[in-house]
Amino acid sequence: MSSRPPASPPAQGSRLLLLSLLLLGTVPGPRPGSAFYLPGLAPVNFCAEEKSNECKADIELFVNRLDSVESVLPYEYTAFDFCQASEGKRPSENLGQVLFGERIEPSPYKFTFNKKETCKLVCTKTYNTEKAEDKQKLDFLKKSMLLNYQHHWIVDNMPVTWCYEVEDSQKFCNPGFPIGCYITDKGHAKDACVISSEFHERDTFYIFNHVDIKIYYHVVETGSMGARLVAAKLEPKSFKHTHIDKPDCSGPAMDISNKASGEIKIAYTYSISFEEEKNIRWASRWDYILESMPHTHIQWFSIMNSLVIVLFLSGMVAMIMLRTLHKDIARYNQMDSTEDAQEEFGWKLVHGDIFRPPRKGMLLSVFLGSGTQILIMTFVTLFFACLGFLSPANRGALMTCAVVLWVLLGTPAGYVAARFYKSFGGEKWKTNVLLTSFLCPGIVFADFFIMNLILWGEGSSAAIPFGTLVAILALWFCISVPLTFIGAYFGFKKNAIEHPVRTNQIPRQIPEQSFYTKPLPGIIMGGILPFGCIFIQLFFILNSIWSHQMYYMFGFLFLVFIILVITCSEATILLCYFHLCAEDYHWQWRSFLTSGFTAVYFLIYAIHYFFSKLQITGTASTILYFGYTMIMVLIFFLFTGTIGFFACFWFVTKIYSVVKVD
C-alpha cells in the first residue's frame, strides 16, 4: 500500500517538557553526544546470540502514554484496546515522569537483534457492535483517531520515530505516530489520512494496524562487544488482512465505517529489519531527531532581538548612572559645602522617606522569599540542563531536578522573607514564616489538585496517583517547611538591614504626578521590554508543553534567562529613577510590580496562543490549559517581581549612600 509522507506533519511531535532538556550544538558548549550522556547513561550492546556478560540478543520495545494536540488529556497504553504484553516488568519512573503523565509499559512487540521478520502477527481484536462493552471500546478508539492521538514507542531508551518530508523538502522526525485517521462525511481527509489515496471512503476511520520498523546499529570498534542501536524508525500502514491467521500485509486499508455493524476484526502486525549505520555513533544518536526540529534560525533571531533590547536599556541606565546621577551627586555635594545651599531638589528631596516601610510589608516580604526560591531554582536547573544532565535521554530529569531544588531552597526563602520583613519594621515573625511556607506553594498546590481531580474524572494517565500526592506533601511539609523555618530563624536573628539615610518621622507629601509618573502607567510600561526578550522562547516552550514538541535548546534558554534578569533589572531601575525625580518615594511595591507585570503579558500571550495556535477542544481540556497556565503565570510573576525589587533596592541604596545628607 502506498505510504507517501504528508506534506505537513499530522502532529507536532512528542512532548518532553516544559518539559525535556539540553544544549545541543546551538551555542558553544559540549558536543551533542557528550552532553546527552554526561549523567552516565551506559550504552547497551546487542548481538545475534545472547552473551550475558557482554551483550544482549533480545530487544525490548516499551510503550509510553498516548497524547494529542487536540486534547490536554493523555491516556496510558492500557486504556486502549491494543495488543497487551503477556509478561514483562514495568520500568520504574522518577517523580518528573509521573508529574508529566508518562506511563512507560512493556509491549507485546519482541525482537531479536539482526533477525528480520515480515508481517508477523501480534494479536487480533474482535468487536461485536451489538455488545455494549465492545461498542464502548470501539467508540473510544474512534474518538482517539478523531482527536489524532499519537503512539510513543521506545527502544533502548530512544524514541521510535516516524520520519517524513515537510515544507521545503525538509525531513521531520516525529517521536510519535498516529493511531489512525478519519475521512469526514464530506470527504475531507483529516491528519494522517492525507498520506494515501486509498483513504477515501466518507465518514470512515482508518486504523494503522501495521508498522514497518527499521533499527539502525553501529558495530562497536572492538568487534567482540557486538553493536549499539543508533536509530529506530517506523512507517505506519493500514491493512485489512485477508487471512488473519496468516497475514501477508497486502490488500486494502483497514477501514471502520461509522455506520459499520456486526463483527469487526482488526489484526495487528509488524515487520522488522536491521541495517548497519557507520556514520552515526551511539553518543550522537539523538542528533537526527533534534536536527530535524524546525526554527533554529528563529532562535538566533530571538537572541539578537533580546540583545538589542538589553543594549538599549544598558545605554539608558549607563547614561543615567554616569552622566545624570554623577552630575546630580556632584551638585548636591557642592551645594552642601556652601553656606547658602538651603534648598534641595530632585531625588535627594525624598532621602528622609526613601526607606519608609511599604504598605503590606508582610505580603511583599513573603513574595520576595518565594521569588528568591524560584529564582535560584531556575538558575541551577537551567545550568544543569546546559551541561546535559537533564537531556531528553534522561526522562523526567528536568521536573525531578526542579522539584528537589525547590524543596531544598526553603532556607533562602525563609531567610530573605525574614530579613526584609524585619527591615520593614514587622514584628509578627510567626505569621511571616507561616505565610512564606504556605501561601504561594499552597496556591500552586490547590490549583494543581483541582486540575488533578479533573484528570482523575477523565481517566487520564496525567492524573497523579494518590501515593505520589502524599510524597509531594511529605516533601513540602517534612523538608521544605522546616528548612524555611531554619532560614527565617537566621534572618530574624540578624540585625535589620542598615540604610544609608535616616527616615523622617513625618511622611513627606508627594506632589501631583504627571500621567507618565503615576503608578499604573509605569507598571504597564515596565513589563513590555522584558516580555519582548522572551516571547519567541515562550512560543517554543508552550509548543513543547501543549503541542508535544521536543524542547532541547537550553543553551538558548539559559542566555535568554540571563538577558531577562538584566532587562528586568534595568527597566525597573530606569523607571525607579524617573519616579524618584518626581519626588515619589513609594518604590518598593512599584519595583516589584513593574517587572512582575511581565507575567501579565505572559498570560495575554498564553490566551492568544490558545486561540490562534492550538486545536484543543472540550471543556475539560480548556479548563486544564488555563489552570496550568495560571500556575506558570504566578511562578513567573514572583520570579520577575523579585528581580525588579532587588535591582531597585540595590540602586536606591547605592545612590543615597554617596550623597551628603545633613
Swiss-Prot record:
Keyword Manganese: no
Signal peptide (from-to): 1-28
Cytoplasmic domain ranges by topology: 321-373, 419-436, 487-521, 575-590, 652-662
Lumenal face residues: 29-299, 395-397, 458-465, 543-553, 612-630
The keyword Cytoplasm is annotated on this UniProt entry: yes
InterPro entries on file: EMP70
Location in the cell: Endosome membrane; Golgi outpost; Cytoplasm, Cytoskeleton, Microtubule organizing center
GO biological process: ceramide metabolic process; glycosphingolipid biosynthetic process; regulation of heparan sulfate proteoglycan biosynthetic process
Keywords attached to this entry: Cytoplasm, Cytoskeleton, Endosome, Golgi apparatus, Membrane, Signal, Transmembrane, Transmembrane helix
GO cellular component: endosome membrane; Golgi apparatus; microtubule organizing center
Membrane topology: Multi-pass membrane protein
Top-level taxon in the UniProt lineage: Eukaryota
Coiled-coil zones: none
Residue intervals passing through the bilayer: 300-320, 374-394, 398-418, 437-457, 466-486, 522-542, 554-574, 591-611, 631-651
Function statement: In the intracellular compartments, may function as a channel or small molecule transporter.
PANTHER family reported for this sequence: TRANSMEMBRANE 9 SUPERFAMILY MEMBER 2, TRANSMEMBRANE 9 SUPERFAMILY PROTEIN
Homology family: Belongs to the nonaspanin (TM9SF) (TC 9.A.2) family.
Protein name: Transmembrane 9 superfamily member 2
Lineage: Eukaryota, Metazoa, Chordata, Craniata, Vertebrata
